[in-house]
Amino acid sequence: MSTSKSENYLSELRKIIWPIEQYENKKFLPLAFMMFCILLNYSTLRSIKDGFVVTDIGTESISFLKTYIVLPSAVIAMIIYVKLCDILKQENVFYVITSFFLGYFALFAFVLYPYPDLVHPDHKTIESLSLAYPNFKWFIKIVGKWSFASFYTIAELWGTMMLSLLFWQFANQITKIAEAKRFYSMFGLLANLALPVTSVVIGYFLHEKTQIVAEHLKFVPLFVIMITSSFLIILTYRWMNKNVLTDPRLYDPALVKEKKTKAKLSFIESLKMIFTSKYVGYIALLIIAYGVSVNLVEGVWKSKVKELYPTKEAYTIYMGQFQFYQGWVAIAFMLIGSNILRKVSWLTAAMITPLMMFITGAAFFSFIFFDSVIAMNLTGILASSPLTLAVMIGMIQNVLSKGVKYSLFDATKNMAYIPLDKDLRVKGQAAVEVIGGRLGKSGGAIIQSTFFILFPVFGFIEATPYFASIFFIIVILWIFAVKGLNKEYQVLVNKNEK
């Protein structure tokens, strides 16, 4: 009897630690490996792209890149993707897009990065044009370092195309409902484990004592890893098509749930939906407020990181360390987030994100505005300069804001859709994705880039008081939106329970 109990206990423990059945490993492990390779590249690109742009062009250029290059490029990429889907099989679409990224990484690693003087315009010409046309100086500087701008854009597109689109589309296509409940939670943990691995890889290859290549080619080993990783993604995808999709135990198209077509609304239709439904408008405001407030703090923080770590290598190593902490904090929030949601009200859970943003944002901006006071009173005690403390507080703010998003912010946002009737839920969610998604991601960048165009003599140092003011206004509006949405939410919940 005791042996049977012990076996049952071990069986249950195994299901908690590794909920994948033995025969399913043939499907899960290659899928997980594909995701790991995609995320290894994703997190490496995220660390490197800022290092090139911030140190060679300027922190201010990031908002211009996001608004005027990345956003249009994402639209063009989606149009090309749709066209490819019309003329090629889905399997071949995957190969074409992944091969494009692989080809670009090779081009950048062996041509654009090693020979910047050959591919970029004359530095003096760019500087003279910037002085002659100050309102457009950031556009001119971006053109002057166009290869780094292209790398930044490709890095942004990798996450959108490879992870959000191609990987999840493939995973959703071949995964049964019963499998998804076990597979997808494991994917979430794996996703965040890729971040600390990236941090270790970047820290090793960019360390001053590591001399694998010439000093001016320090990033080449990282590019080689990304090229290898991209090649492994293609091989794994090919293997799965040959060995998993032909195994009836693991893939039966008839058993895979038919995907429901999501409601698609135009930009104008989405605006009408948001302005005519107070409930949907509140949800859109939450998403916009989150995206804008994160971008406003992140821009100022990155300008301070550049002051502390002025070289590409030092800056990239620091961003790698940032991702290390972000990965573990995200895992911690994933584990505790569901418990918080079970034990507190919707209002309390939804308030955690804006209050955390307000408190950490206030601490970050305080260390910038009152750096002279801090230098006199706290530097000796804390054995750190005001700049170091500001960068540290900014990193904590960024780590927490991204960690809490996936566990609490997204969960409470999705819970808010549940009490709505089916028509409003489907159309409202589509409207929020169109308006909230676009304005949330690009809103902060639009504010910053417009400010720098109107006031060309300003950099982040001069503009920080204005960005801080906008940040606090946005977060306060966010808090009021949560309160307003909670009232509407409780009315619908009580109505549905009757």
Swiss-Prot record:
Lineage: Bacteria, Pseudomonadati, Pseudomonadota, Alphaproteobacteria, Rickettsiales
Keywords attached to this entry: ATP-binding, Cell membrane, Disulfide bond, Membrane, Nucleotide-binding, Transmembrane, Transmembrane helix, Transport
Family: Belongs to the ADP/ATP translocase tlc family.
Protein name: ADP,ATP carrier protein 1
GO CC term, one of those recorded: plasma membrane
Positions on the Extracellular side per record topology: 55-67, 114-147, 206-218, 301-320, 370-379, 460-465
Membrane topology: Multi-pass membrane protein
Top-level taxon of the source organism: Bacteria
Chain ranges passing through the membrane: 34-54, 68-88, 93-113, 148-168, 185-205, 219-239, 280-300, 321-341, 349-369, 380-400, 439-459, 466-486
Paired cysteines (S-S): 37-85
Keyword Amino-acid biosynthesis: no
Known role: Provides the rickettsial cell with host ATP in exchange for rickettsial ADP. This is an obligate exchange system. This energy acquiring activity is an important component of rickettsial parasitism.
An example Gene Ontology biological process: ATP transport
Binding-site positions, ATP: 436-442
Subcellular location field: Cell membrane
Pfam families per record: TLC
GO molecular function: ATP binding; ATP:ADP antiporter activity
SUPFAM superfamilies, sorted: MFS general substrate transporter (SSF103473)
Ranges facing Cytoplasmic side: 1-33, 89-92, 169-184, 240-279, 342-348, 401-438, 487-498
InterPro entries recorded: ADP_ATP_car_bac_type (IPR004667), MFS_trans_sf (IPR036259)
